A protein has these predicted regions:
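ATP-binding N-terminal substructure of ATP-dependent carboxylate-amine bond-forming enzymes
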Residues: 3-114, 119, 123-125, 129, ...
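Active-site nucleotide/adenylate-binding loops and adjacent lid/helix of ATP-dependent enzymes
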Residues: 13, 18-23, 74, 79-80, ...
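Short, small-residue-rich loop/turn micro-motifs
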Residues: 25-28, 166-168, 247-249
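Short acidic/His/Gly/Ser-rich catalytic and metal-binding motifs that mark active-site loops
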Residues: 30-34, 170-172, 238, 252-253
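Hydrophobic residues at beta-strand termini and immediately following loops
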Residues: 67, 147, 181, 229, ...
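Generic preference for hydrophobic
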Residues: 86, 113, 144, 164, ...
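Phosphate-binding site of ATP-dependent enzymes
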Residues: 184-254
Length: 254
């Protein structure tokens, strides 16, 4: 009989063999088969990623159930299926709060899931809102302006160079070497293009040159633990000055 803690606030399980853990995910191949393009599905996962997660959980002695994406989760819940815990890596497809949809649904059914809750997911996907909260908390973040319409472009009063990207995307979607902006003409061109393509506001911020790192953190406050640090180094044939969609999509070559 053991006690095991999962990365969910205050969640402990005492068990003699296993915990039934549901896996929620967006499988990229499924969406490509439905006709979605590669950029739209850029954040979604591959089969080998799901296999690796499932193997790791099973190696810890737990039972796994593959659920799938949001609509598949809705169907399973309607059928009366339940799990002790859900390991959620769903990105979602529709809406600016799409990453919060699976956690919110599970909260309604009182089924715990790993990682952030629905509120945190909704706040952090919107980079403008995230930066506003960080700034008001007194933490350093690059000066920024959120461009919601073409008319807002003239309101940007930040010195060049600037960096522009969709306010609520990931995996480099909407990011390219053109994202580094050095003139008012470039600012209008890039923002207009992003507003039309992604149908959401554009985050414009002071360009920060230099080295780029990704730091994995598990937990909150005093319980936070750094899992590892990764430095992004672009090769000579990569798009420069930006960890772009192309660089991420073709990472093995870049």
């Amino acid at each position: 009989m053991g006690t095991e803690r999962f990365p969910v606030t205050g969640l402990f399980f005492s068990h003699g063999g296993f915990v039934k853990i549901g896996l929620t995910f967006d499988l990229r191949s499924e969406y490509l088969a439905m006709g979605y393009d590669r950029e739209t599905t850029a954040e979604f996962d591959r089969e080998d990623t799901i296999d690796a997660i499932e193997t790791a959980i099973r190696d810890c002695g737990h039972q796994t159930v593959r659920i799938g994406h949001l609509r598949q989760l809705v169907s399973r819940l309607a059928e009366g299926q339940r799990w002790d815990l859900v390991f959620n890596i769903c990105e979602g497809l529709h809406g600016i709060g799409r990453e919060a949809q699976v956690p919110a649904l599970l909260e309604g059914y009182q089924i715990p899931c790993v990682f952030a809750d629905s509120l945190m997911m909704a706040v952090c996907l919107h980079k403008g809102l995230t930066k506003t909260l960080i700034d008001r908390a007194g933490l350093a973040t690059a000066p920024f302006h959120v461009v919601a319409t073409v008319a807002d472009i003239d309101q940007v009063q930040l010195p060049f160079p600037l960096f522009a990207k969709p306010v609520a995307e990931g995996t480099g979607k909407g990011v390219s070497s053109a994202s580094v902006i050095r003139s008012a003409t470039e600012l209008r061109t890039v923002c207009t293009d992003l507003l039309q393509r992604f149908r959401q506001p554009v985050l414009v911020e002071t360009f920060l040159p230099g080295r780029e790192f990704t730091v994995g953190i598990l937990g909150t406050g005093e319980d936070a633990t750094v899992l590892g640090t990764l430095e992004v180094k672009l090769l000579s044939n990569a798009e420069q000055d930006a960890y772009s969609y192309v660089n991420k999509e073709r990472y093995a070559e870049m």
